Structure formats: structure tokens, C-alpha cells
């Protein structure tokens, strides 16, 4: 392991180390949000709402592919970070090689299971009429690219786990920029509409994966793709999946949650869906900054969990303070200029009014959301698979009964407030789980929670 990487893991100031690992993740997350908006923006130029709906309906499938990548990426990545903290540089090769080829095999399985059933899957996602054909076409390209989508998530996580977050950011940046360029060429130049958008995403993932592969082959003696190291032991399997499975489950349940929420909103018409769509995109900016912050420090927490628990506690304190500052700034902006922000996306008075209300409520949940991200990250980083699994289930499931109750009592307003209620429950549960497991994390965890 290079001295520069060890410096940020062990010797730099807590804030400097946190920024080194988290800023690339935050930038990469924001680029993904921007890309998502631009993707819809480009398709919107074609003037066909069915195409826009098709892309939106495929989001749960993307969540599944991301979850499969996280299974080995987060599971293997956090284990690699813990092995580096324990100075076990040989076992990292076995973990990385097994994770990479395991992810590729999962991708091939996805292709075999789905490629001849895209229309049926599109129908299950809610596609009807003209939207069905566009959704099926988009899904076909998405499924064919599954091995590289999964591989991209694995390799990006591995770059961060070995202390190379800048490389992770470059890979994500290259993917997003190439995606935007290809969208423009394929959608408009070749008139491929949604298929062009899907191909742009697929090709960009292939290129980004190749970038990571070349980097690891040339620069890393920790991550390997050699088949000779694909020898999973019981210990390796347990350590990868006890952290990776909760991350996988979280992605799956987030996709299910989004699908259920859309079904509830659909009962109030397009105005409700459009209003939530706008507010959701705006909330995503600070939310993904915080998510990037929390995900970025996972390797730092994992490393110091093995070597310096006092430093780990300080890292967690600094992250919490940073989340509070981000939350405060966002609340001031939303409550002073929220109406104007929504107006950028729509001039419909009803949509602007409802979206502004949704924005204020959902932004209020940002602090609790951030705490949930951090404590779940702590559980992942320290190998507490059972606690992380419970959190993953709660974050995906709690919202559903809350939606039923609040919708029945208060209608659309209740649906909006259900988001804040669910985040409150999950944040409290996360703090309780970490408190109960405090002896397995660090003896100072109780003091941290009380403080």
C-alpha cells in the first residue's frame, strides 16, 4: 500500500482525510444526478411523454443492477479496507478476484434470465400501450449490459477501498461525460430515441470499467483479476456477504419503495407525480452530497476500526457536524427561495405550489436521512452484517405501511408527510442498533451517541 494512501488512512487531520475520501464520491454522485436530469431533458426534446415514462419505469431495474454491484463492491470493498488496516495484503487479492468474477457471473445470469422476457418485465413495471414498446426496448439494452454495469459498481468501490478516491471520481466523471455525449449523438444523430439513451449508458459503463481495469493492472498490487486467486473460503464468503447483502437489499428495497410511492401518487393524477418528480430531483442534490460523504468515509472508518478506534470516533463526529451544516444551509435556501427553484422546472401554478410544499417537507427529512446513511455506513464498515441488514430492510419497508396509513387519513398531504415520518423511524432505529452493538464497534460509541 502506498505511503500517500496510508497518510490519509492514518496520519492526516480527520477533516482532511474525510474530504480526501468523500469529495470524489460527492462529486460523482452529483454528476449522476445531473446526468439523470439531462437524460430526461434530451428525451424531452422528442416531445413524446411515453419515452420519458419508459425511462422512469426502468429505475427499479437499475436499482437491482446497482444492488448486485454493491453486493460484491461494498461487501468486498469494506472487507479489503479492514484487511489493509490489519496489514493483510495477500488476502485482499483473493477477495478482489472472487468479487470481480462473482459480479461478472451474476451479470451473465441476469442476461440469461431476462433477455427473452423484456416485454413481460416492462408490463410488470407498469408499462402500458405505447410506453410498453419503449420500455421493453430500453430494458433489452440494459439487461445485455448488466455484466459491465455490475462490474463498474464493483471496481468503483474497490478504488475507494484501497485509498484511491480520486481514481474513483475520474472513472465516474468519465462515465457521466461520455454518457451525455453519446446521448446527444445516439438520440438525435442516429434517431435512436430511448434505445440511444440506453446504449449511451451501456457504452459509458463499458469504457469506465475498462478504465478501472487498466488502473488496477498497472498501479495496484492489492486488487487483482487473476483467476488463480478465485478461491473463496468460508471466511471470505461470510465477510463479503454479511456486509454486501445488506447493501444489495437496500438497493432492491429502495427500488420497490420508489415503485410503491409512484403508485400512490398516480392516484392523484399527473400533477402529483410531476410535483414529486421536481422536488425529488432538487432534494437529491444535498441528499447525494451527504450520501457521498457517508459512503466516502466508509473505508476510512473500516481501516481505523482495525487500527485506531479513537480516530474512528473523531471521524464520525466530524461527519455528523458536516451533515448538520449542510442541512442548515439547505433549509435556509429552501424556505427562502423554494418557490423560485421549482419555477425553473414548471410554470404550472398547481405544480409549483404542490412541489414547493413537497420540497420543504422532504428537505426537512435531510438531517435524519443523513444520520441514517452514516450509521448504516458505520455498520457496513465495521462488519456488523446483521445490523446493516436490519437497517436495509427498515429503510425499504417502513415507508410502505406509513404510506397506507397517512394516505388513508390525509390523502396527498399525508403521502408527502409519510416521507419525513419514515425517515424519523429509520434514523432512530439506526441509532438504537449502533448503540446496542457499541461494544463490537468501540467502547466510546455510547459516549458518542450521548454527545
UniProtKB/Swiss-Prot annotation:
Membrane-related topology note: Multi-pass membrane protein
Transmembrane segments: 26-46, 54-74, 98-118, 134-154, 162-182, 194-214, 245-265, 282-302, 315-335, 355-375, 397-417, 418-438
Keywords linked to the UniProt accession: Antibiotic resistance, Cell membrane, Membrane, Transmembrane, Transmembrane helix, Transport
Major localization class: membrane
Positions of disulphide bridges: none
GO biological process terms held by the UniProt record: response to antibiotic
Gene Ontology CC: one annotated term: plasma membrane
GO molecular function, one term: xenobiotic transmembrane transporter activity
Pfam families: MatE
Function comment: Multidrug resistance efflux protein.
Family as reported in the entry's similarity comment: Belongs to the multi antimicrobial extrusion (MATE) (TC 2.A.66.1) family. MepA subfamily.
The protein, known as: Multidrug export protein MepA
Amino acid at each position: 500500500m502506498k505511503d500517500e494512501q496510508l497518510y490519509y488512512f492514518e496520519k492526516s487531520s480527520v477533516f482532511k482525510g474525510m474530504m480526501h475520501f468523500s469529495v470524489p464520491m460527492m462529486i460523482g454522485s452529483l454528476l449522476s444526478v445531473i446526468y439523470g436530469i439531462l437524460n430526461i431533458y434530451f428525451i424531452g426534446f422528442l416531445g413524446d411523454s411515453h419515452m420519458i415514462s419508459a425511462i422512469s419505469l426502468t429505475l427499479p431495474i437499475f436499482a437491482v443492477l446497482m444492488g448486485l454491484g454493491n453486493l460484491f463492491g461494498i461487501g468486498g470493498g469494506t472487507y479489503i479496507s479492514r484487511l489493509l488496516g490489519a496489514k493483510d495484503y495477500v488476502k485482499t487479492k483473493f477477495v478482489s478476484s472472487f468479487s470481480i468474477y462473482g459480479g461478472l457471473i451474476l451479470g451473465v445470469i441476469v442476461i440469461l434470465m431476462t433477455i427473452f422476457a423484456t416485454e413481460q418485465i416492462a408490463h410488470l413495471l407498469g408499462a402500458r400501450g405505447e410506453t410498453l414498446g419503449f420500455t421493453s426496448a430500453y430494458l433489452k439494452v440494459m439487461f445485455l449490459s448488466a455484466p459491465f454495469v455490475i462490474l463498474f459498481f464493483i471496481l468503483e468501490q474497490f478504488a475507494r477501498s484501497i485509498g484511491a478516491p480520486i481514481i474513483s471520481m475520474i472513472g465516474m466523471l468519465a462515465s457521466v461525460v461520455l454518457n451525455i455525449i453519446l446521448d446527444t449523438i445516439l438520440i438525435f444523430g442516429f434517431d435512436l430515441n430511448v434505445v440511444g439513451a440506453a446504449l449511451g449508458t451501456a457504452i459509458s459503463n463499458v469504457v469506465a470499467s475498462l478504465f478501472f481495469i487498466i488502473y488496477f493492472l498497472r498501479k495496484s498490487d492489492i486488487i487483482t483479476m487473476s483467476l488463480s486467486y478465485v478461491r473463496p473460503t468460508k471466511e471470505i464468503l461470510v465477510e463479503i456477504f454479511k456486509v454486501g447483502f445488506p447493501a444489495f437489499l437496500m438497493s432492491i428495497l429502495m427500488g420497490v419503495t420508489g415503485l410503491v410511492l409512484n403508485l400512490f401518487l398516480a392516484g392523484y393524477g399527473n400533477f402529483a407525480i410531476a410535483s414529486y418528480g421536481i422536488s425529488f430531483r432538487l432534494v437529491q442534490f444535498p441528499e447525494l452530497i451527504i450520501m457521498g460523504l457517508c459512503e466516502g468515509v466508509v473505508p476510512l472508518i473500516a481501516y481505523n476500526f482495525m487500527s485506531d478506534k479513537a480516530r474512528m470516533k473523531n471521524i464520525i463526529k466530524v461527519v455528523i457536524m458536516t451533515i448538520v451544516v449542510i442541512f442548515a444551509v439547505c433549509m435556509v435556501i429552501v424556505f427562502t427561495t423554494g418557490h423560485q427553484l421549482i419555477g425553473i422546472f414548471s410554470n404550472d401554478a398547481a405544480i409549483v405550489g404542490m412541489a414547493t410544499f413537497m420540497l420543504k417537507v422532504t428537505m426537512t427529512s435531510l438531517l435524519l436521512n443523513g444520520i441514517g446513511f452514516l450509521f448504516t455506513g458505520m455498520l457496513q464498515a465495521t462488519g456488523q452484517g446483521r445490523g446493516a441488514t436490519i437497517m436495509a430492510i427498515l429503510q425499504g419497508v417502513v415507508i410502505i405501511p406509513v404510506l397506507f396509513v397517512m394516505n388513508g387519513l390525509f390523502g396527498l398531504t399525508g403521502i408527502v408527510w409519510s416521507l419525513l415520518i419514515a425517515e424519523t423511524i429509520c434514523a432512530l432505529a439506526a441509532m438504537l442498533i449502533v448503540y446496542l452493538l457499541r461494544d463490537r464497534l468501540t467502547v466510546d460509541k455510547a459516549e458518542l451517541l450521548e454527545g
